[in-house]
């Protein structure tokens, strides 16, 4: 029996999303098992591995009073994830399939951080870029995935949706 093309596209996106989530979760598990909280290991001159817990959102916004707010963030995240998944499912035609690639990056990162936030109460961050004493916000692979997806969305909308 031949599988319809729409299911092949959905399967490709599913495996893409699953692999990014697995990479994110495995990297965070490695950090937990190999570093102490706030321990820093230099990798290269401008990058450290630095284990921190982010009780807030991006760039540690809303990080004070993590208790109740965590449930609200989990609820908001789950609603956003469902909306993106529904949008992706509706865009499985060949014309719209490449629109789903940025969505796949974003949904992967959202799910990776959602898992941390809902099961641990915080997100594990560990990538620390710096120049001398100036440090960018510490982040993780899920955050990188969200960033890549956002850049791809901007690129797609700027160069492919001119009509």
Curated annotation (Swiss-Prot):
On the tree of life, the source organism's domain of life is Bacteria
Q: Where are the transmembrane segments?
A: 3-23, 70-90, 94-114, 134-154
Q: Please list the GO terms describing molecular function.
A: aspartic-type endopeptidase activity
**Segments forming a coiled coil:** none
Q: What is its EC number?
A: 3.4.23.36
Topology within the bilayer: Multi-pass membrane protein
Q: Where is the active site?
A: 125, 143
Subcellular localization is given as: Cell membrane
Write down the chemical reaction(s) this protein catalyses.
Release of signal peptides from bacterial membrane prolipoproteins. Hydrolyzes -Xaa-Yaa-Zaa-|-(S,diacylglyceryl)Cys-, in which Xaa is hydrophobic (preferably Leu), and Yaa (Ala or Ser) and Zaa (Gly or Ala) have small, neutral side chains
Q: Which NCBIfam families match?
A: lspA (TIGR00077)
- Name the family: Belongs to the peptidase A8 family.
Name of the protein in question:
Lipoprotein signal peptidase
